[in-house]
Amino acid sequence: MLKLFTLLIFLTSLGSLEDTTSNESLYDIKIEGIDGNTIDLNQYRGKKILFVNVASKCWFTYQYDQLQELYTTYKEKLVIIGLPCDQFRNQEYGTALEIKTFCRLNYGVDFPLTSKIEVKGKNQHKLYQWLTMKSKNGKKNSSVKWNFKKYLVDEKGELIDVFYSFTKPMSKKITKLI
């Protein structure tokens, strides 16, 4: 009886050795666009996606020029999604209209922008949970410590790499992966 009990415990413990990574797909996540409409990431299957947490009053705001250039250059195979965030020294405008107007008038931004989101903390958006947690993205853990951190995802919705704020959008580090 003891042998049978030991065998049952052993077999039960094997189940806990299974891969604990999430099967949640990036494409299951929805984001509110800057105009209030839902952005369904599923529409971007087959294209790479560069996610960038942006802020209009940040030292890195100049990167909007290169983000727009990158988007225009690789539009057939890449989408850039700018995600306004106010978590780093309140460097984003208050309303969606202010953000959208600033980006369009000053930088000619025509890639998708979302409503303001939280990229860290207890109210971290589901997208950023996926981007920053290996248990969800299957590749690596990371944290967002400042504006203009970039996450590149491939055509199948798998994380390729993460780039810090100092990495310019048109750098070879990014363009060679597109």
Could you describe each region identified by the protein language model?
Residues L4-S13:
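Sec-dependent N-terminal signal peptides
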Residues L17-N42, Y62, K126:
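N-terminal "domain-start" segment that seeds a small globular fold
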Residues G33, N53-K57:
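Amphipathic alpha-helical repeat scaffolds
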Residues K47-K48, K57, T61-C85, R104-Y107:
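Conserved helix-turn-beta segment immediately C-terminal to the redox Cys motif
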Residues N53, K77-G94, V109-G121:
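Thiol-based oxidoreductase modules, predominantly thioredoxin-like and allied folds used
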Residues L97-N147:
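Short, internal strand/loop/helix patches
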